[in-house]
Curated annotation (Swiss-Prot):
Lineage, opening ranks: Eukaryota, Metazoa, Chordata, Craniata, Vertebrata
Cytoplasmic side: 1-12, 483-509
SUPFAM superfamilies: MFS general substrate transporter (SSF103473)
Regulation: 4-guanidinobutyrate and guanidinoethyl sulfonate inhibit the transport activity.
Signal peptide: none
InterPro entries registered for this protein in UniProt: MCT9, MFS, MFS_dom, MFS_trans_sf, Proton-linked_MCT
Similarity-based family: Belongs to the major facilitator superfamily. Monocarboxylate porter (TC 2.A.1.13) family.
Transmembrane segments annotated in the record for this chain: 13-33, 53-73, 80-100, 102-122, 137-157, 164-184, 305-325, 342-362, 372-392, 398-418, 433-453, 462-482
GO molecular function: carnitine transmembrane transporter activity; creatine transmembrane transporter activity; monocarboxylic acid transmembrane transporter activity; symporter activity
Matching Pfam families: MFS_1
Protein name as it appears in the record: Monocarboxylate transporter 9
Topology term for the membrane: Multi-pass membrane protein
Length: 509
């Protein structure tokens, strides 16, 4: 069924509002997991590397499972998937309050909540794109701020709930808040259901010939059967012995329900051959699609700038994601007193990320700015800021660095521009899917690696030197790959809107 023309308004603004709320409710706790990370360290007494897996899984699983999430939305629709994801997120959070050990949290918080976030993000983006065309960039920009606002508010909210109700009470209350996703999801009316009449019921015997199992275009059924019989003339392939009484056939194919002859009916023989041929052609078609996909993937990696971009995004997520998870513990390790905290460091990261998305997206719209080099600049500056964290020993310096890192993390808003410049608009979806998979891998690996460095050295200094080195290395690799290709990268290929749905992924602010 074809969708109606996007209304660019009307009920679409309701979709934008509830999508904003769902992302706020869904991503608030996983993105502000750094507050819970400290409590889990005290509650379970595990190492920082092992404990960091909880937050990293919640962030990375949604990206790693993005193909499955897209398939679910395509198969069942945005509204059912949103409601189901609400159950997953709320259930995972509430289940985490009963966790007896850290391994249970890997499943309840890391996998269940993370997968729920991935499903919800895909659903909200899909239905928003259906309702908006001319104003799609604005609509997607509005819903994407839900996660950043959620990070800003939930960082302080979870800290307060832990003080008043303890860790378990905090998770129960946050999980109860997430149940509001179900109410929001119920308002996500599919676009085609607005005024499309329900299909009429048709009796099986009234079905036209076009609903037969297979009918080659331009030929009648008898000609098709002759072609099939030539391919499958062997008696061993086509003969089916009917014995021991009646055999009941599918009422959609034959009106006579039973056959009592011991000799094989000619019509059934033809139908078997027809179905066999159809299945064979379907298998060949699937194999051809798989070969085409692999061929296109190989062709993408022959582009040296794309290969460098793949390395850069992996290294960026390994090194750039840990601060949002570990910054609160960094402050505690630096003996910063809680009385000095004007605002949680994670809240600063969250609000500055929203500002960075907006300003970097505006900069990318200027024709005289090459977005590839703008993205490289954000990587290099972020790498230097990460290397400066070991020298920050006060709340003011940590807050300043948190703001810088948060602003630069907003480079997700220009990442689709970079991908478009590298591979072209026609290959954007394929290339972006590959890049996001490895971004999820980096998100999952980064915090545990930094935590392991702390367990090994009992200080975050080497850990953040390593993080900064990773991001710097990715930036310089991308810069070196792009410099000789300035002419090809500087061509003004068609650009998506600066806030298009591709820039934000299931686990990033």
């Amino acid at each position: 069924m074809e969708l109606k023309k996007s209304p660019d308004g009307g009920w679409g603004w309701v979709i934008v509002f509830v999508s904003f709320l769902t992302q706020f409710l869904c991503y608030g706790s996983p993105l502000a997991v750094g507050v819970l990370y400290i409590e889990w360290l005290d509650a379970f007494g595990e190492g920082k590397g092992k404990t960091a897996w909880v937050g990293s899984l919640a962030s990375g699983v949604g990206l790693l499972a993005s193909p499955v999430c897209s398939l679910c939305v395509s198969s069942f629709g945005a509204r059912p998937v949103t409601i189901f994801s609400g159950f997953m997120v709320a259930g995972g959070l509430m289940l985490s309050s009963f966790a007896p050990n850290i391994y249970f949290l890997f499943f309840s918080y890391g996998i269940v909540v993370g997968l729920g976030c991935g499903l919800l993000y895909t659903a909200t983006v899909t239905i928003t794109c259906q309702y908006f065309d001319d104003r799609r960039g604005l609509a997607l920009g509005l819903i994407s701020t839900g996660s950043s606002v959620g990070l800003f508010i939930y960082a302080a909210l979870q800290r307060m709930l832990v003080e008043f109700y303890g860790l378990d009470g905090c998770l129960l209350i946050v999980g109860a808040l997430a149940l509001n996703i179900l109410a929001c999801g119920s308002l996500m009316r599919p676009l085609q259901s607005s005024d499309c009449p329900l299909p009429k019921k048709i009796a099986p015997e009234d079905l036209p010939d076009k609903y037969s199992i297979y009918n080659e275009k331009g030929k009648n059924l008898e000609e098709n059967i002759n072609i099939l019989d030539k391919s499958y003339s062997s008696e061993e392939k086509c003969r089916i012995t009917l014995a021991n009484g009646d055999w009941k056939q599918d009422s959609l194919l034959h009106k006579n329900p039973t056959v009592t002859h011991t000799k094989e009916p000619e019509t059934y023989k033809k139908k078997v051959a027809e179905q066999t041929y159809f299945c064979k052609q379907l298998a060949k078609r699937k194999w051809q699609l798989y070969k085409n996909y692999c061929g296109e993937t190989v062709a993408l990696f022959k582009n040296k700038v794309f290969s460098a971009l793949f390395i850069a995004i992996l290294l960026f997520d390994i090194g750039g994601f840990p601060p949002s998870l570990l910054m609160e513990d960094v402050a505690r390790s630096s003996n910063v007193k809680e009385e000095e905290f004007i605002m949680p460091l994670i809240s600063i990261i969250g609000i500055m990320t929203a500002v960075g998305k907006l300003l970097l997206g505006i900069l990318a719209d200027f024709k005289w700015i090459n977005t590839l080099y703008l993205y490289v600049a954000t990587l290099i500056i972020m790498g230097l800021a990460l290397c400066a964290i070991p020298f920050a020993k006060s709340y003011v310096t940590l807050a300043l660095l948190s703001g810088i890192l948060g602003f630069l993390t907003g480079n997700w808003s220009i990442f689709p521009y970079v991908t478009t410049k590298t591979v072209g608009i026609e290959k954007l979806a394929h290339a972006y899917g590959i890049l996001m998979f490895f971004a999820g891998l980096g998100n999952s690996l980064g915090p545990p690696i930094v935590g392991w460095f702390y367990d090994w050295t009992q200080t975050y200094d080497i850990a953040f030197y390593f993080s900064g080195f990773c991001v710097l290395l990715g930036g310089f690799i991308l810069l070196l790959a792009a410099l000789p290709s300035w002419d090809t990268c500087n061509k003004q290929l068609p650009k998506p809107a600066p806030t298009t749905f591709l820039y934000k992924v299931a686990s990033n602010v």
